Amino acid sequence: MRILILGSGVVGTASAYYLAKAGHEVTVLDRQRAAGMETSFANAGQVSPGYSAPWAGPGIPVKAIKWLLMHHRPLVVWPSLDPKLYLWLAKMLANCTEEAYRRNKARMVALAEYSRDALDALRSETGIAYDERMLGTLQLFRTRKQLDHVHSDTEVLDAHNVRYELLDPSGCIRAEPALARVRDKFVGGLRLPGDETGDAHIFTRNLADICARQGVTFRYGVTVEGLRHEAGRITGVALAGGEIATADIYVAAMGSYTPALLAPLGIRLPVYPVKGYSLTLPITDPDAAPRSTVMDETYKVAITRLGERIRVGGTAELAGFDLSLREPRRATLAHSVGDLFPAGGDISKATFWTGLRPMTPDGTPIIGPTKLDNLFTNTGHGTLGWTMACGSGRVLADLIGGRAPDIDTADLSVARYAEAA
């Protein structure tokens, strides 16, 4: 079949790879000049099945108030007249129960574990390189209260046979030796040895090259203006300049911009842009830098080694589609990395970036068919687009090809939101 994918981020490009591998004729459209130039460009670098969890959970409303009042705030909400923001927040709050948290985390971990295995297989098949490391993630707790609350997460990890290690400070230092310099800053950690790291942008660009050699067509600098439909099917994609691009199957993988594309069709995706920031700084002392990813639980900041660089990613800012770089967010990232790895990198040479994470209220992406026969979605991965990209692309290819995916996908489509079913 001829398949048109809208979006060449890590999720759209991974979808192209698996669909082409299944024998389809694939074309990818993107407004940027190359693949992976938006949310995939400078994210935290984690491929972290074990850390896959919804933001909505028990106690989050109270924690959110605390975060909003912190000097280095992990959460920022700007006043808005956009009703979509408040509808999304209401749905998120409805998922803050213990039952919903366990259900959502379980399916997120299942997809993320499957995706990590798919990534490993893809790497073996193609030899793709992306500053990858397979040294796990260390979730670092600065307070005893944080450490005591980790047990609800480990119960889900146990249920899915995800390996983990609860560590005292000495164990944390064995995992990340550079932390010996700041031993007084933390009380323990949760290590997820099956997690990986890598540069999502490099991966996406290299995978796009592999796809192109497999016959996938990438059309960059193309602006999608809308979808044409008739009799319950998409009949074409309207592009700037008047062109109508056609195919047999259409895949919407435009991240935070997907809801606006589908809304005129009567498909309401509860996906809202949650702005994240990152710093990328050169390593000055390899022995004083992280070996893999350290997640600073207090500030919700991930500090990741990518080759000769340190990537520092974090902050959840609800500001619509605003992409301005705000200095207080930079200060939070700089504080976290400077506090834990003070001699690891040169903060004066850091590059500052921001991107929009497409978040659903329950944390789970929206993958699969819609009410239009030939329209599929692959979006809503939030902070886990890199973690879930390969598994999501493989699941999508199976669904389009009429094959049963290797994992349960019953709750991945938009149908789980009753008003959009």
From Swiss-Prot:
Known EC number: 1.4.99.-
A Pfam family the protein falls into: DAO
Record-listed FAD binding positions: 3-17
GO (cellular component) term, any one: cytoplasm
Pathway(s): Amino-acid degradation; D-alanine degradation; NH(3) and pyruvate from D-alanine: step 1/1
InterPro entries xrefs: DadA (IPR023080), FAD-dep_OxRdtase (IPR006076), FAD/NAD-bd_sf (IPR036188)
Top enzyme class: oxidoreductase
Gene3D superfamilies to which the protein is assigned, alphabetical: D-Amino Acid Oxidase, subunit A, domain 2, FAD/NAD(P)-binding domain
Keywords, in A-Z order: FAD, Flavoprotein, Oxidoreductase
Entry GO MF terms: D-amino-acid dehydrogenase activity
Cofactor(s) the protein requires to work: FAD
Catalysis performed (reactions): a D-alpha-amino acid + A + H2O = a 2-oxocarboxylate + AH2 + NH4(+)
GO biological process: D-alanine catabolic process
SUPFAM superfamilies per UniProt: FAD-linked reductases, C-terminal domain (SSF54373), FAD/NAD(P)-binding domain (SSF51905)
Function per UniProt: Oxidative deamination of D-amino acids.
PANTHER family: D-AMINO ACID DEHYDROGENASE, SARCOSINE DEHYDROGENASE-RELATED
Family from the record: Belongs to the DadA oxidoreductase family.
Name recorded for this polypeptide: D-amino acid dehydrogenase
Species name: Xanthobacter autotrophicus (strain ATCC BAA-1158 / Py2)
